[in-house]
Amino acid sequence: MTLIHMNILMAFSMSLVGLLMYRSHLMSALLCLEGMMLSLFVLAALTILNSHFTLANMMPIILLVFAACEAAIGLALLVMVSNTYGTDYVQNLNLLQC
Protein backbone atom coordinates (compact mmCIF):
# COMPACT_ATOMS: atom_id res chain seq x y z
CA MET A 1 0.00 0.00 0.00
CA THR A 2 1.47 3.30 -1.05
CA LEU A 3 1.65 6.47 1.00
CA ILE A 4 -1.06 8.16 -1.07
CA HIS A 5 -3.49 5.31 -0.46
CA MET A 6 -2.76 5.42 3.26
CA ASN A 7 -3.38 9.19 3.36
CA ILE A 8 -6.69 8.82 1.54
CA LEU A 9 -7.81 6.02 3.84
CA MET A 10 -6.78 8.13 6.82
CA ALA A 11 -8.85 11.05 5.47
CA PHE A 12 -11.83 8.71 5.09
CA SER A 13 -11.43 7.34 8.60
CA MET A 14 -11.05 10.83 10.08
CA SER A 15 -14.25 11.91 8.34
CA LEU A 16 -15.99 8.82 9.70
CA VAL A 17 -14.77 9.56 13.23
CA GLY A 18 -15.91 13.16 12.81
CA LEU A 19 -19.33 11.94 11.71
CA LEU A 20 -19.58 9.71 14.77
CA MET A 21 -18.36 12.38 17.20
CA TYR A 22 -20.13 15.50 15.92
CA ARG A 23 -23.50 14.08 15.00
CA SER A 24 -25.57 16.52 17.02
CA HIS A 25 -25.51 19.26 14.36
CA LEU A 26 -26.69 18.56 10.83
CA MET A 27 -24.13 20.86 9.21
CA SER A 28 -21.21 19.02 10.84
CA ALA A 29 -22.63 15.67 9.76
CA LEU A 30 -23.04 16.90 6.18
CA LEU A 31 -19.46 18.19 6.07
CA CYS A 32 -18.12 14.87 7.35
CA LEU A 33 -20.20 12.97 4.79
CA GLU A 34 -18.83 15.22 2.05
CA GLY A 35 -15.28 14.50 3.20
CA MET A 36 -15.99 10.78 3.08
CA MET A 37 -17.39 11.00 -0.43
CA LEU A 38 -14.48 13.09 -1.71
CA SER A 39 -11.92 10.68 -0.28
CA LEU A 40 -13.80 7.78 -1.90
CA PHE A 41 -13.75 9.68 -5.20
CA VAL A 42 -10.00 10.23 -5.06
CA LEU A 43 -9.40 6.61 -4.03
CA ALA A 44 -11.54 5.31 -6.90
CA ALA A 45 -9.81 7.57 -9.42
CA LEU A 46 -6.35 6.53 -8.22
CA THR A 47 -7.27 2.86 -8.27
CA ILE A 48 -8.55 3.08 -11.83
CA LEU A 49 -5.49 5.03 -12.97
CA ASN A 50 -3.10 2.55 -11.36
CA SER A 51 -4.85 -0.59 -12.61
CA HIS A 52 -5.52 0.70 -16.18
CA PHE A 53 -9.03 -0.76 -15.98
CA THR A 54 -10.71 1.13 -18.82
CA LEU A 55 -14.20 -0.27 -18.31
CA ALA A 56 -14.56 1.49 -14.95
CA ASN A 57 -13.52 4.99 -16.05
CA MET A 58 -17.00 6.37 -15.36
CA MET A 59 -17.22 5.07 -11.78
CA PRO A 60 -15.59 8.14 -10.10
CA ILE A 61 -17.84 10.47 -12.11
CA ILE A 62 -20.94 8.52 -11.08
CA LEU A 63 -19.76 8.65 -7.46
CA LEU A 64 -19.29 12.41 -7.77
CA VAL A 65 -22.83 12.78 -9.18
CA PHE A 66 -24.27 10.85 -6.23
CA ALA A 67 -22.22 13.00 -3.84
CA ALA A 68 -23.61 16.17 -5.44
CA CYS A 69 -27.17 14.84 -5.15
CA GLU A 70 -26.56 13.92 -1.52
CA ALA A 71 -25.19 17.38 -0.79
CA ALA A 72 -28.15 19.10 -2.47
CA ILE A 73 -30.69 17.02 -0.56
CA GLY A 74 -28.78 17.53 2.69
CA LEU A 75 -28.65 21.30 2.24
CA ALA A 76 -32.35 21.43 1.38
CA LEU A 77 -33.08 19.46 4.54
CA LEU A 78 -30.81 21.78 6.54
CA VAL A 79 -32.62 24.88 5.25
CA MET A 80 -36.02 23.32 5.97
CA VAL A 81 -35.08 22.30 9.52
CA SER A 82 -33.41 25.62 10.34
CA ASN A 83 -36.42 27.58 9.04
CA THR A 84 -38.85 25.41 10.98
CA TYR A 85 -37.03 24.99 14.30
CA GLY A 86 -34.39 27.72 14.27
CA THR A 87 -31.52 25.28 14.92
CA ASP A 88 -29.74 22.57 12.97
CA TYR A 89 -29.86 19.82 15.59
CA VAL A 90 -30.25 16.31 14.21
CA GLN A 91 -32.65 15.45 17.03
CA ASN A 92 -35.21 17.79 15.40
CA LEU A 93 -35.42 15.35 12.48
CA ASN A 94 -36.83 12.59 14.66
CA LEU A 95 -40.59 12.47 14.12
CA LEU A 96 -41.14 9.90 16.88
CA GLN A 97 -40.26 12.22 19.76
CA CYS A 98 -42.69 12.47 22.67
UniProtKB/Swiss-Prot annotation:
Membrane topology listed for this record: Multi-pass membrane protein
Compartments in which it is found: Mitochondrion inner membrane
UniProt keyword list: Electron transport, Membrane, Mitochondrion, Mitochondrion inner membrane, NAD, Respiratory chain, Translocase, Transmembrane, Transmembrane helix, Transport, Ubiquinone
Membrane-spanning segments: 1-21, 29-49, 61-81
Record's catalysed reaction(s): a ubiquinone + NADH + 5 H(+)(in) = a ubiquinol + NAD(+) + 4 H(+)(out)
Protein family (similarity comment): Belongs to the complex I subunit 4L family.
Job description of the protein: Core subunit of the mitochondrial membrane respiratory chain NADH dehydrogenase (Complex I) which catalyzes electron transfer from NADH through the respiratory chain, using ubiquinone as an electron acceptor. Part of the enzyme membrane arm which is embedded in the lipid bilayer and involved in proton translocation.
Quaternary context: Core subunit of respiratory chain NADH dehydrogenase (Complex I) which is composed of 45 different subunits.
Protein name, entry field: NADH-ubiquinone oxidoreductase chain 4L
Organism: Eschrichtius robustus (California gray whale)
